[in-house]
Amino acid sequence: MRVLITGGGGFLGTWITKQLLDSGFSVRVMDMNTSPGRARIQEHSPSHHLVEWVEGDIASSHDVHAAAQGCQSIVHLAGVLTPACRNDPIKGAHINVIGTLNAFEAARKHGITRVIYTSSGGVFGPSDGQFPFPTTHYGAFKLANEGSARAYWEDHQIASIGMRPFVVYGPGRESGLSAGPSLACRAAALGEAYEIPFTGSAGMVYVKDVALAYKAAVKSAFTGAHTLNLTGQIASMQDVITAIHQVIPTARVSCKGPPLPSAADSVNEYNNGLLPLGAEKSLLEGVKETIHYYQSLAPSN
């Protein structure tokens, strides 16, 4: 099976690509600039030479349709994050909403019956993790995409799963509003000081666990339009700092600022009746793996 991954050259895409390659899938990655992604996957997977790279714009229906030709499944990751959507909502909608419609339309055109796409824990407001009520443009765009996914199932029987990861952390997470915990791990590993720019509690989900969920979805013969909360472990930023200190007692990490605009009381749906998934990593296990990764990159090593 050949899988198209839109936006596959980024942080999460690299991890998903590795998981799919390790399971014998053919992978085609479409991204605006493939050079950074090539370097990332070369570092993480010995099968990196098997990836087919296509440069294209998710907001261009022509580019997406061309990239989807010959594929049997689509993993749609391409998009811009909260800060970019806040700074330019119209451009953000063009990429995040029209781009998602382009992915589903490409599936319809090429007879692809399943799309796994990235939604977000941001569909929930800051105080209620049970009922979607976003207070950011990014969250609003993601919620709109979930509605479109249901419409594609009703109108065209294109099945879908919208993954709602909360704060994804781990090796390689170095940009975005919620990258602070990963950057703190990197700083600790390199002997540097770092202040996480927010406080409060959030769902902390390790990137490998998220990638495994996407792989399970690609392998599954599910029907219907679904969403899954990938909440991980609810933890405060002080919990993150404590975990870092358990690995490196001398780490100079702290936190300061307002909490993230996302609820911390959502039900974790990682273990569900839809996909066969195992146990998630604990916060301490994930922090330890992240720190060890960055230690392995230090000049002394």
Regions found by a protein language model. Give the residues of each.
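Conserved Rossmann-fold NAD(P)-dependent oxidoreductase catalytic core, especially the SDR/UDP-sugar
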Residues: 76, 98-137
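Conserved glycine-rich Rossmann-like NAD(P)H-binding loop of the short-chain dehydrogenase/reductase
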Residues: 25-36
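Active-site segment of SDR-like NAD(P)-dependent oxidoreductases
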Residues: 80-82, 121-128, 166-169
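C-terminal substrate-binding subdomain of Rossmann-fold SDR/epimerase-dehydratase oxidoreductases
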Residues: 192, 197-200, 204-301
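NAD(P)-dependent short-chain dehydrogenase/reductase
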Residues: 137, 150-202, 209
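NAD(P)H-binding glycine-rich loop region in Rossmannoid oxidoreductase-like domains
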Residues: 55-94
